[in-house]
Amino acid sequence: MAPSRKFFVGGNWKMNGRKQSLGELIGTLNAAKVPADTKVVCAPPTAYIDFARQKLDPKIAVAAQNCYKVTNGAFTGEISPGMIKDCGATWVVLGHSERRHVFGESDELIGQKVAHALAEGLGVIACIGEKLDEREAGITEKVVFEQTKVITDNVKDWSKVVLAYEPVWAIGTGKTATPQQAQEVHEKLRGWLKSNVSDAVAQSTRIIYGGSVTGATCKELASQPDVDGFLVGGASLKPEFVDIINAKQ
């Protein structure tokens, strides 16, 4: 990892927890040592963004797990970046594979969300990744480059964007991409950014890995030169998340 890229660890709590259990988790996180050279962001369920921001130590940022592409309006069940900021969160996760494949969000919609979230001043954790059949068909690069292109077309300021490579076959399955598999895709993504955006953006943009990251797998993954951090699911709800935060130490 280049020294200019600050290690980034996101915890995606998904649709989990209640105030009591999340309060206990927050207590653990507040007591944890967070290295000065590591950025930590937690993404609670929407109903608990306010709660998490009030309880979490300021050293840990808060993200929403999703947002919509416009400011206000007749969009029942949606939240806007402006609302997210009003609750004290500063980041949003967009394009997560569960949004793409469970809720049918298209590349185009995700791109529009990215553009609006950035315009409203949120940082964006933009997720990309291939399914198992796509990897087996040998089209991993084609899929992730197409997804990345739509995101890229909607980004003006790369300083507020973190790319999260999440192979769909490794999310919640217990299968983790090997450090070599992760590094290979991250390196190719950085090369794509260099060719299609700029060398400066390729060098400065953090590309983090998601997909069954645990306390046991994080250190070797973190040692790869193009792995700049993690987006953690299940393990972010457990005390081992502290080990993942400290994976570079």
Swiss-Prot record:
Subcellular location: Cytoplasm
Positions bearing Phosphoserine: S80, S106, S159, S198, S212, S223
Keyword Transcription regulation: no
GO BP annotations, alphabetical order: gluconeogenesis; glyceraldehyde-3-phosphate biosynthetic process; glycerol catabolic process; glycolytic process; methylglyoxal biosynthetic process
Catalytic activity, as annotated: dihydroxyacetone phosphate = methylglyoxal + phosphate; D-glyceraldehyde 3-phosphate = dihydroxyacetone phosphate
Signal sequence interval, chain numbering: none
Classification via Pfam families: TIM
Binding site for substrate: N12, K14
GO molecular function, one term: methylglyoxal synthase activity
Cross-link named Glycyl lysine isopeptide (Lys-Gly) (interchain with G-Cter in SUMO1), sites: K142
Keyword hit for Isomerase: yes
Residues that bear Phosphothreonine: T173, T214
UniProt entry keywords in alphabetical sequence: Acetylation, Cytoplasm, Gluconeogenesis, Glycolysis, Isomerase, Isopeptide bond, Lyase, Methylation, Nitration, Phosphoprotein, Ubl conjugation
Annotated catalytic residues: H96 (electrophile), E166 (proton acceptor)
InterPro entries given in the database record: Aldolase_TIM (IPR013785), TIM_sf (IPR035990), TrioseP_Isoase_bac/euk (IPR022896), Triosephosphate_isomerase (IPR000652), Triosephosphate_isomerase_AS (IPR020861)
SUPFAM superfamilies xrefs: Triosephosphate isomerase (TIM) (SSF51351)
N6-succinyllysine: residues carrying this PTM: K149, K156, K194
Pathway connected to this protein: Carbohydrate degradation; glycolysis; D-glyceraldehyde 3-phosphate from glycerone phosphate: step 1/1; Carbohydrate biosynthesis; gluconeogenesis
Listed EC numbers: 5.3.1.1, 4.2.3.3
Main function: Triosephosphate isomerase is an extremely efficient metabolic enzyme that catalyzes the interconversion between dihydroxyacetone phosphate (DHAP) and D-glyceraldehyde-3-phosphate (G3P) in glycolysis and gluconeogenesis.
UniProt similarity note: Belongs to the triosephosphate isomerase family.
NCBIfam families referenced in this protein's UniProt entry, alphabetically: tim
Quaternary assembly: Homodimer.
Name this polypeptide is given: Triosephosphate isomerase
Gene from which the chain derives: TPI1
